[in-house]
Design a protein with these regions (language model features):
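Bacterial N-terminal signal peptides that target proteins for export
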Residues: 1-9
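C-terminal segment of classical bacterial N-terminal signal peptides
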Residues: 14-22
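Low-complexity, acidic/polar, glycine-enriched regions of mature
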Residues: 21-203
Length: 203
Protein backbone atom coordinates (compact mmCIF):
# COMPACT_ATOMS: atom_id res chain seq x y z
CA UNK A 1 0.00 0.00 0.00
CA UNK A 2 2.73 2.43 0.91
CA UNK A 3 4.69 1.70 -2.16
CA UNK A 4 1.99 3.10 -4.24
CA UNK A 5 2.33 6.43 -2.72
CA UNK A 6 5.70 6.95 -3.98
CA UNK A 7 5.18 5.95 -7.50
CA UNK A 8 1.99 7.83 -7.85
CA UNK A 9 3.05 11.02 -6.38
CA UNK A 10 6.11 11.41 -8.45
CA UNK A 11 4.24 10.66 -11.56
CA UNK A 12 2.17 13.70 -11.10
CA UNK A 13 4.99 16.10 -11.69
CA UNK A 14 5.01 15.14 -15.29
CA UNK A 15 1.56 16.52 -15.82
CA UNK A 16 1.82 19.95 -14.30
CA UNK A 17 5.45 20.63 -14.96
CA UNK A 18 5.08 20.29 -18.68
CA UNK A 19 2.25 22.78 -18.79
CA UNK A 20 3.49 25.29 -16.22
CA UNK A 21 7.25 25.52 -16.56
CA UNK A 22 8.79 28.87 -17.49
CA UNK A 23 8.50 30.20 -20.95
CA UNK A 24 12.02 29.33 -22.00
CA UNK A 25 11.19 26.01 -23.58
CA UNK A 26 14.77 25.21 -24.46
CA UNK A 27 15.80 25.70 -20.85
CA UNK A 28 12.83 23.81 -19.41
CA UNK A 29 12.95 20.78 -21.70
CA UNK A 30 15.03 17.82 -20.64
CA UNK A 31 15.47 15.30 -17.86
CA UNK A 32 14.74 16.14 -14.23
CA UNK A 33 15.86 14.16 -11.20
CA UNK A 34 14.18 14.00 -7.83
CA UNK A 35 15.90 16.06 -5.13
CA UNK A 36 15.81 13.35 -2.48
CA UNK A 37 16.78 15.82 0.24
CA UNK A 38 13.51 17.66 -0.36
CA UNK A 39 10.96 14.93 -0.92
CA UNK A 40 8.65 12.87 1.26
CA UNK A 41 6.27 10.00 0.69
CA UNK A 42 3.66 9.42 3.38
CA UNK A 43 0.69 7.05 3.48
CA UNK A 44 -2.35 6.83 5.74
CA UNK A 45 -4.65 3.91 6.42
CA UNK A 46 -7.68 3.65 8.71
CA UNK A 47 -7.19 1.68 11.91
CA UNK A 48 -10.30 0.10 13.45
CA UNK A 49 -12.37 3.08 12.37
CA UNK A 50 -10.75 5.08 15.17
CA UNK A 51 -7.82 6.90 13.60
CA UNK A 52 -5.49 7.00 10.60
CA UNK A 53 -2.19 5.20 10.97
CA UNK A 54 0.63 7.00 9.14
CA UNK A 55 4.03 5.87 7.87
CA UNK A 56 6.53 6.73 5.15
CA UNK A 57 9.13 5.40 2.71
CA UNK A 58 12.57 6.91 3.13
CA UNK A 59 14.23 5.66 -0.06
CA UNK A 60 12.76 6.39 -3.47
CA UNK A 61 13.93 7.96 -6.71
CA UNK A 62 12.38 9.35 -9.87
CA UNK A 63 13.25 10.66 -13.31
CA UNK A 64 11.06 13.01 -15.33
CA UNK A 65 11.52 13.68 -19.06
CA UNK A 66 9.59 16.71 -20.31
CA UNK A 67 9.21 18.83 -23.43
CA UNK A 68 7.02 21.95 -23.00
CA UNK A 69 6.19 21.82 -26.71
CA UNK A 70 4.70 18.33 -26.29
CA UNK A 71 3.39 18.18 -22.71
CA UNK A 72 1.37 15.01 -23.29
CA UNK A 73 4.56 13.13 -24.13
CA UNK A 74 6.12 13.70 -20.70
CA UNK A 75 7.38 10.54 -19.07
CA UNK A 76 7.93 9.79 -15.41
CA UNK A 77 9.56 6.69 -13.95
CA UNK A 78 9.64 6.10 -10.20
CA UNK A 79 11.18 3.39 -8.06
CA UNK A 80 10.65 2.76 -4.35
CA UNK A 81 12.64 0.61 -1.95
CA UNK A 82 10.06 -1.23 0.21
CA UNK A 83 12.70 -1.98 2.85
CA UNK A 84 12.88 1.74 3.64
CA UNK A 85 9.48 1.82 5.33
CA UNK A 86 9.40 3.74 8.62
CA UNK A 87 6.38 3.52 10.92
CA UNK A 88 7.77 5.08 14.09
CA UNK A 89 6.62 2.02 16.06
CA UNK A 90 7.28 3.01 19.71
CA UNK A 91 8.07 -0.43 21.15
CA UNK A 92 11.13 -1.40 19.13
CA UNK A 93 12.55 -3.31 22.09
CA UNK A 94 9.57 -5.67 21.85
CA UNK A 95 9.67 -6.24 18.08
CA UNK A 96 10.90 -4.75 14.82
CA UNK A 97 7.56 -3.78 13.31
CA UNK A 98 9.08 -2.18 10.22
CA UNK A 99 11.02 -5.36 9.46
CA UNK A 100 7.87 -7.40 9.94
CA UNK A 101 5.98 -5.33 7.37
CA UNK A 102 8.90 -5.53 4.93
CA UNK A 103 9.44 -9.29 5.16
CA UNK A 104 5.95 -10.68 5.71
CA UNK A 105 4.22 -12.31 2.70
CA UNK A 106 1.06 -10.68 4.08
CA UNK A 107 2.42 -7.22 3.42
CA UNK A 108 5.40 -6.08 1.30
CA UNK A 109 7.21 -9.40 0.93
CA UNK A 110 10.34 -7.51 -0.15
CA UNK A 111 12.44 -10.63 -0.66
CA UNK A 112 10.18 -11.66 -3.54
CA UNK A 113 9.31 -8.12 -4.64
CA UNK A 114 12.33 -5.86 -3.93
CA UNK A 115 11.09 -2.89 -5.95
CA UNK A 116 7.95 -0.87 -6.46
CA UNK A 117 7.73 0.85 -9.82
CA UNK A 118 5.55 3.43 -11.52
CA UNK A 119 5.63 4.46 -15.17
CA UNK A 120 3.33 7.24 -16.37
CA UNK A 121 1.04 6.58 -19.35
CA UNK A 122 -1.14 9.70 -19.68
CA UNK A 123 -1.56 13.25 -18.42
CA UNK A 124 -4.77 15.29 -18.16
CA UNK A 125 -4.44 18.96 -17.32
CA UNK A 126 -7.21 20.13 -14.97
CA UNK A 127 -6.10 23.71 -14.33
CA UNK A 128 -3.24 26.17 -14.74
CA UNK A 129 -1.20 24.32 -12.14
CA UNK A 130 -3.10 21.09 -11.60
CA UNK A 131 -3.34 17.79 -13.42
CA UNK A 132 -4.31 14.15 -13.20
CA UNK A 133 -1.48 11.75 -13.91
CA UNK A 134 -2.26 8.14 -14.75
CA UNK A 135 0.31 5.39 -14.94
CA UNK A 136 1.08 1.73 -14.37
CA UNK A 137 1.98 0.89 -10.79
CA UNK A 138 3.63 -2.44 -10.09
CA UNK A 139 3.31 -3.62 -6.49
CA UNK A 140 3.72 -7.19 -5.23
CA UNK A 141 4.07 -8.35 -8.83
CA UNK A 142 0.68 -6.89 -9.81
CA UNK A 143 0.41 -4.00 -12.26
CA UNK A 144 -2.62 -1.71 -12.13
CA UNK A 145 -3.43 1.76 -13.50
CA UNK A 146 -3.48 4.48 -10.85
CA UNK A 147 -4.27 8.21 -10.97
CA UNK A 148 -2.91 11.01 -8.82
CA UNK A 149 -4.08 14.61 -8.39
CA UNK A 150 -1.07 16.90 -8.55
CA UNK A 151 -0.47 20.59 -7.91
CA UNK A 152 2.58 22.46 -9.14
CA UNK A 153 3.63 24.65 -6.21
CA UNK A 154 6.27 26.60 -8.08
CA UNK A 155 9.19 26.67 -10.50
CA UNK A 156 12.41 28.66 -10.54
CA UNK A 157 16.10 28.67 -11.27
CA UNK A 158 17.50 26.81 -8.27
CA UNK A 159 19.53 29.37 -6.24
CA UNK A 160 22.35 26.91 -5.53
CA UNK A 161 22.21 24.45 -8.42
CA UNK A 162 21.64 27.24 -10.98
CA UNK A 163 19.31 24.94 -12.91
CA UNK A 164 15.53 24.82 -13.53
CA UNK A 165 13.68 23.38 -10.52
CA UNK A 166 10.09 22.32 -9.83
CA UNK A 167 8.14 21.73 -6.63
CA UNK A 168 4.81 19.94 -6.29
CA UNK A 169 2.31 18.20 -4.03
CA UNK A 170 0.46 15.02 -4.95
CA UNK A 171 -2.46 13.18 -3.38
CA UNK A 172 -4.16 9.96 -4.33
CA UNK A 173 -5.92 6.85 -3.08
CA UNK A 174 -5.57 3.17 -3.87
CA UNK A 175 -7.07 -0.09 -2.64
CA UNK A 176 -4.33 -2.38 -1.40
CA UNK A 177 -6.49 -5.45 -1.97
CA UNK A 178 -6.29 -4.81 -5.72
CA UNK A 179 -2.58 -5.56 -5.49
CA UNK A 180 -3.10 -8.70 -3.43
CA UNK A 181 -2.47 -7.16 0.00
CA UNK A 182 -5.63 -8.39 1.69
CA UNK A 183 -4.32 -9.24 5.16
CA UNK A 184 -6.39 -7.68 7.98
CA UNK A 185 -8.65 -5.79 5.59
CA UNK A 186 -11.54 -4.74 7.79
CA UNK A 187 -9.59 -3.91 10.93
CA UNK A 188 -6.99 -2.12 8.84
CA UNK A 189 -8.46 -0.16 5.96
CA UNK A 190 -8.33 -1.31 2.36
CA UNK A 191 -8.15 2.26 1.06
CA UNK A 192 -4.74 3.89 1.40
CA UNK A 193 -4.27 7.65 1.09
CA UNK A 194 -1.00 8.83 -0.45
CA UNK A 195 0.64 12.18 0.29
CA UNK A 196 3.67 13.32 -1.67
CA UNK A 197 5.85 16.41 -1.52
CA UNK A 198 8.76 16.68 -3.96
CA UNK A 199 11.25 18.90 -5.72
CA UNK A 200 12.87 18.08 -9.08
CA UNK A 201 16.03 19.63 -10.52
CA UNK A 202 17.06 19.49 -14.17
CA UNK A 203 20.11 17.35 -14.86
Amino acid sequence: MLKTALALGLAAIAAVSTTSLPATANDAAGTYKLDRAHASLVWKVNHLGLSFYTARFDTFDATLDINPDEPQSAKLEVTVDPTSIRTGFPFSDAKDFDKELVQSPNFFNAKEHPEIKFVSTSIERTGDKTAKVTGDLTLLGVTKPVTLDVTLNGQMAHPMKKKPALGFSGVGKIKRSEFGMTHLVGGVGDEVELLLEAEFIKE
